[in-house]
Structures are given as structure tokens and as C-alpha cells.
Amino acid sequence: MTSPLAIYRIQFRPSFGFVDAARLVPYLHGLGISHLYASPVFQARACSEHGYDITDPNSLNRQLGTEAEFRELVGMLHAHGMGLILDIVPNHQAASTQNPAWRSVLEHGPASPFAAWFDIDWGADPDGKLRLPVLGAPVDEILERDELRLDIDEGSGPHLRYFDTRYPLSSASWALLLEAPAGASRPALVAAMVAGLREATPEAALRVESDLVRAYRDDEHVRAYIDVALDHFAPGTTGARARLRDLLALQHYRLLYWRTGVETINYRRFFDISDLAGVRQEDPRVFDE
């Protein structure tokens, strides 16, 4: 490893990726630059303009280019006797449902295999929930305006949707959601899966949920049943808001009005940015995983 003599920082973004940086190497070498200091290159939130809101620290950011293009950049630097300094952002990640680790924590709470990654004080909430200051108004107003809805797609199954954000459901709430509506006969496959979800580990629950999503896509009887169950939570349906409140009570997170929620937040943030969650970098196991 050579000691840096002259460093030039580059800011990656969707409009400036690995190929663009590689083209600059000969020019920067001619200026006497010894090292590039690069902004984060790992997978970040969609359309991130800075890359510090990392969602997967084990994958390159697809918006910046391919692995082959990244290797070409590194090869170009080496060919010119230059080095690369990477900002790996070890101290925080995106508190976003686009982040699989954070999403797992939302779905499974302290039982998530990723719960130890983040500095969360579960005991600070009376019900042991992760407190999320993400709503544009108190939750009762949000429910009255029908802005929080239960939705489903063929890729990820049922979820709570607040505008463009989708929040995962706990295994216990899947069971509530899929209880047989009045007059409906629950398919045996759904009944078996619901039973499997009640006491499942996060890993087992993920498999059951994947099977259920596949059945929703491929089995017309399962699809029809789940659609009827979802209709009981739809805006305008009698008792729908009360059912949504019951569903919210079963989650491992508490959705809060952002103006007041920040006063009782129970996870460490990056400075005062609520959508960047602090990573427990003092624990080597976080980086081993």
C-alpha cells in the first residue's frame, strides 16, 4: 500500500458512475493525483444522489455500474500507479424498507437476525416497539383520512402502504389478516400456512410467507380468498379502520407523527437524520455478517 500524496475526491451518482470515473484517471494522473477518494459504492436507496443511505453493504450500487465496470476502474487506477480510498460508511445505514436488514427488523422485531446491527432501545417503548417518526400527522388522523392502507402485490405479499412506502407485516398480523371472513371458506393451504406462521422463527416465517405469496400468484382459490380478506380492511368498509388499528397493534414498530415522534425516537440516528440508522460498529459481529 502506498501513502497518499495527492487525493482527489469523486462523488458517484446515477449520472456519474464507474465508467465515467475510469475516463478521468489518465487526466488525474497527469495532474499528479496519487489516489481517488470515492463516495460510497455500495447499494443505496433508489435514485440516491450521494450514496450514503446504504441499503446493502455487501453489493455494489447497480445505479453506478456493474462489477466488471468497477473492476475496470480499479484496473485503470493500478495501471497508472494510483490507489483507491473507499468510504464504506461503517457507522450508519438507510432506515428504509429498501434495506433488507432494516425491513427484517420491522417485520420480526428483536427476533430478527439483524436486530443487533442497529442501536435500538426496545425498552424505551411501553410495548417494546421500534418507534418510527414517519407520518405526516398523528396516526388517528392518518387513519381517518384513509392514507394508511393494507395492500398486496404478487412479489412481496400483504403490506401496509403509506403513500410510496410499504411497511412489512409481522407474522402474527398475517394470521389476523387471513382469518376466515364471515361466509368465506378458508383454503386448507392457507390454514396450514397461518398455523405455521404463529410460532415460526424469522427464517421459517420467511419461507412460509414466500410460499403464501407464490400461492397467491398461482392458485386462483387462494387468491380469491386473500382478496376477500383484504377487502375487510379497505376504505369505506364497515369496521375497516378498527381492523387496521388492531393490525397496527400487532406490528413490531410504531408509526408516529414526525414532528412529535422525533422526541421519543428509540434508535440511534446519524446526527438528527431519522432515515439514517446508526450501526453498532463497536460490535465486530456486525461486520462479520
Where do the protein language model's features map onto the residues?
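Alpha-amylase-like alpha-glycosidases and glucanotransferases acting on alpha-linked glucans and related
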Residues: M1-L5, R9-S15, C47-D53, N58-I85, ...
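Catalytic domains of carbohydrate-active enzymes, especially glycoside hydrolases
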Residues: A21-R45, E69, E289
